[in-house]
Amino acid sequence: MEYAPLGLIGLLTPQANTTVEPEAWALLPTGYSLINARLVSQASSLNQRLLDYVDQLESSLLQFANAPLSVLSLACTGSSYLMGCDQESQWIEAWQKRLGIPVVTAGVAVARALQTLGVRRLDLLSPYDQA
């Protein structure tokens, strides 16, 4: 593919997220490109929206139509927190088999990066409340 000779990333972001796309473009190595689609939900509660993003993935994927994706990336850590590691791993494995391409979530990507860097302890500061 002319504009993505090394790979085309399908990036799924939450419906109102304004940061993932510019950050992804800034970090993207030469030879790769990405296309973005939105994860959407009509749920009023945040937790239900985050779960809807995962449960309704198939309809979100329709936005990519027949784009020749090399990898699918779900850029939503909140969904990972609610699924938990075991369910997330099963979900990823099922979608990889179905799509025939690697699938990665933001949560798994962060965990892999920390492991690769040898991080054993991490302090976390968050603007979110306990809910």
Residue ranges of each PLM-predicted region?
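N-terminal glycine-rich anion-binding loop in soluble enzyme alpha/beta folds
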Residues: 1-59, 131
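Short, hinge-like loop/turn segments at secondary-structure boundaries
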Residues: 51-54, 90-91, 121-122
